[in-house]
Curated annotation (Swiss-Prot):
Propiece span(s): 23-43
Keyword Disulfide bond on entry: yes
Protein name: Brevinin-1CG5
Organism: Amolops chunganensis (Chungan torrent frog)
Subcellular location: Secreted
């Protein structure tokens, strides 16, 4: 009976460690995904601003180059 308890305790301990490692890996994966999502979010905010600036300055540049203002 004592050896059975010992074996069950060992299995419980190893299972707990395994679950802990899985949780750490899952948290690390979520952090990596969050960084990727932030990069995409920054990119989404940056591109419209860049397009807006280009829309404002492009006609002025074309006007000066062609001298048809």
């Amino acid at each position: 009976m004592f050896t059975l308890k010992k074996s069950l305790l060992l299995l419980f301990f190893l299972g707990t460690i395994n679950l802990s490692l899985c949780e750490q890996e899952r948290n690390a994966e979520e952090e990596r995904r969050d960084d990727d999502e932030m990069d995409v979010e920054v990119e989404k905010r940056f591109l419209p601003m860049l397009a807006g600036l280009a829309a404002n300055f492009l006609p002025k540049i074309v006007c000066k180059i062609t001298k048809k203002c």
